[in-house]
Amino acid sequence: EVKLLESGGGLVQPGGSLKLSCAASGFDFSKYWMSWVRQAPGKGLEWIGEIHPDSGTINYTPSLKDKFIISRDNAKNSLYLQMSKVRSEDTALYYCARLHYYGYNAYWGQGTLVTVSAE
């Protein structure tokens, strides 16, 4: 059974940093592209980016590539999202996903909530 479990979310101040993690199990993690997707309150899904199985290629949504860094550790079956210079509009539920590729099914985690607030 494919499982994706995100962690690391929480409250962060504007301008701050946060690193999200995703633990994968139930499939050969090292063979798949992996993605991060987010959903802000009351808005649709927004694709953040994706990383090649060997980390050789990382693609980002252009507006986010200067503040988010996607990485992975195949030995630990883990995917990461380093967030920096966060703003209120980065408040969202962040999902780790193995999206559709070459006929394979898509799988999503439950998400981890990031709230950007000075309070």
Curated annotation (Swiss-Prot):
<dbReference type="GO" id="GO:0016064">
    <property type="term" value="P:immunoglobulin mediated immune response"/>
</dbReference>
<dbReference type="GO" id="GO:0019814">
    <property type="term" value="C:immunoglobulin complex"/>
</dbReference>
<dbReference type="GO" id="GO:0003823">
    <property type="term" value="F:antigen binding"/>
</dbReference>
<dbReference type="InterPro" id="IPR007110">
    <property type="entry name" value="Ig-like_dom"/>
</dbReference>
<dbReference type="InterPro" id="IPR050199">
    <property type="entry name" value="IgHV"/>
</dbReference>
<dbReference type="InterPro" id="IPR003599">
    <property type="entry name" value="Ig_sub"/>
</dbReference>
<dbReference type="InterPro" id="IPR013783">
    <property type="entry name" value="Ig-like_fold"/>
</dbReference>
<keyword id="KW-1064">Adaptive immunity</keyword>
<dbReference type="GO" id="GO:0005576">
    <property type="term" value="C:extracellular region"/>
</dbReference>
<dbReference type="InterPro" id="IPR036179">
    <property type="entry name" value="Ig-like_dom_sf"/>
</dbReference>
<keyword id="KW-1280">Immunoglobulin</keyword>
<dbReference type="Pfam" id="PF07686">
    <property type="entry name" value="V-set"/>
</dbReference>
<dbReference type="InterPro" id="IPR013106">
    <property type="entry name" value="Ig_V-set"/>
</dbReference>
<protein>
    <recommendedName>
        <fullName>Ig heavy chain V region J539</fullName>
    </recommendedName>
</protein>
<keyword id="KW-0391">Immunity</keyword>
